[in-house]
């Protein structure tokens, strides 16, 4: 793959060059097939551990500050790197604001599911307000992210049965939203069976989500 020409800031071009230096062309072919919503030419082919390592190296640098302001990104790996940089933001307000600024540009499941600022775990009550907002979004991956945050942070000690209703109330024709709903309910069956099981036994979910939830629950026990 030839690197796309750029009129970006020098800091952004430098980071893009670092990504291309980590390129694995065979992995690019493999990874492109896993993300059918993305044009193959927007995937460089950098493995996730290397992206996370680069994010760690760039954290708190002026280059990273310029990079995260430069939206939209062209390459999948630029979005993934941006997501991993957000994970290290230590102030909750900043992490939330930057996540909300970034979410409209997320265009695939891999970036959507890969990140959550660590500080979110320390502010679960405050995060719920944002999650409700995300669930009502008209952006596919913003909704998916909201359901993912419910699954990540609110199926253990912070669980409340009403959160199941929040996820069930999301109505969408989008595959990547509905798959996350099914994943959420399958995980809820494992972690909060008393609350989650009636959603299946009483057939409260739509048929597709009901069936996919059972499928994912069975697969997770293999």
Question: Predicted segments — roles?
Answer:
Residues 2-222:
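Alpha-helical scaffold domains
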